[in-house]
Amino acid sequence: MTAHIGLSAQHVVDSLGHPDGASRPPVSAESLSRASELLQSNHDTWHIFFREATGHNHMAHSILTALALGASPSELERAYTDTEAIQRPIPAVDPMILTRLDADPQALESLLGWSDLYSTFLTYFQSQIDRHGWQSVVTTYVFSETPLAEKLLIKLYEGMYHSLIHLGLGIEFGQPGIIAEALAQAAAHEDGHIDKLLLGVEAAIAAKDDTRTETTVPKSLVQLVDEVRSHPRIWADLRFGDRWNRMRDSIMDRAADELIPIAAQFRIPASGMMMMAGEHADLLTIRTAEMASTAAYLAGASQSARRPRKIDFFLMHTVTASLFFSVFNAQEWIPRAMRVRLVEWKGRLDLAFYAFCKSPELDACVISDYSDDFTRDMDWAALYAAVNQEHDDGHVAKFMRALRHAERLSRPYEQHPVWAEHFPVKGNMWIKLARMALETTRHSPPDFKWIMGTGFDEAWERPDLKLAENRGQQGQSVP
């Protein structure tokens, strides 16, 4: 059994790719057709992991993002072929396990984390969607708060949010086949122990029986970032060489108890609302925007004073993922309390990613003062056109698209008398950060496009950065 993936013009119109209708690039019928063919090929041909650990197949992300940014058929082909060589064939379905799952869906719980069962999970979720519809299946397996759903929800946040991004794209573009891929990827994903933080925070709040309704302005995420930096017991002993395992082995296994009291302060009332000056404030919308602004700030403002600018690979993912919480917030079939929980988890886990990068110093001027000769005069449309021609695995385009959406989301609050200090990225900082993302990646081979842990001195000792500095690329250096 295989899902049919087919995109229509309405799917793109309804997407969040272009919040301002006037700036929407045209998407041709040929591009829609080619995107559907490429997504179908990826669905039928390739494993969701190109290697056993941390190797996420980004093809669907790249194709859908390029399409949303107005890609031509040839540019969509580029989005597919850029990473085709590294992919692994999709594994065979295990018929015995599939029969077991059909007979007892709860059997899935004991199979979570088996990456070689991806195809089996995919076939199972496709059959469930065919029978019950994708909204019902996502509700049952992700949002129902059963023991199985809780585990699968946590796994959506594992691996730098990749399964969550995949699910968000599937929902945004109305593609049940992509949604099935996301659920199967989450089920097959390795365990990074992030439940120690996410569930630990909720347990700590419940233990205090703290169900108060917010009546005062809460601490900003930026303030909580400062608190993380002020607690070196969380991050001071991190080792650069551990890279992929730092979140599990160091942050979650050894420092979660230190991080929980800080992360627990990022809260939204279950109703998503708050009384302020006699009026209802929509805290779900406000704090979703704040989360996106803070993620962008962490990604752009964490630099080295000794090297040309580079954006951190891990913090970049916190920005990319931020867009999809607007997708989830727009789904009335998801209970509002669950939509609140999704945003709370994102804000709390972003704090862990900041610690994971060794809590780098932050300087907003790094973003606000940024300029380079190539992108200086580019508007968003020019940036979209340029990034669609880049050889990339989709990361730059996803980052840029998320920034554009976050800019629109944050605009009402950037100068707000109550909320302005919660929004560290303001005005033209958004487009300057997008320009930085393009310029600092466009000449780099895949392994050198990003910094891998910006708070570590070792991350900045790469020969390419020393060479760039010696060549006098001061336009990209920190003032």
Curated annotation (Swiss-Prot):
The keyword Oxidoreductase applies. Its EC number is 1.-.-.-. Keywords: Oxidoreductase. Pathway: Secondary metabolite biosynthesis. It is an enzyme of class 1 (oxidoreductase). InterPro entries: Questin_oxidase-like. One of its GO terms (molecular function) is oxidoreductase activity. Residues 14-34 are annotated as: Disordered. The keyword Oxidoreductase applies. Pfam families: Questin_oxidase (PF14027). Belongs to the AflY oxidoreductase family. Baeyer-Villiger monooxygenase; part of the gene cluster that mediates the biosynthesis of the tetrahydroxanthone dimer secalonic acid D. The pathway begins with the synthesis of atrochrysone thioester by the polyketide synthase AacuL. The atrochrysone carboxyl ACP thioesterase AacuM then breaks the thioester bond and releases the atrochrysone carboxylic acid from AacuL. Atrochrysone carboxylic acid is decarboxylated by the decarboxylase AacuI, and oxidized by the anthrone oxygenase AacuG to yield emodin. Emodin is then reduced to emodin hydroquinone by a yet unidentified oxidoreductase. This is Baeyer-Villiger monooxygenase AacuH. It comes from Aspergillus aculeatus (strain ATCC 16872 / CBS 172.66 / WB 5094). The lineage of its organism: Eukaryota, Fungi, Dikarya, Ascomycota, Pezizomycotina. The gene is AacuH.
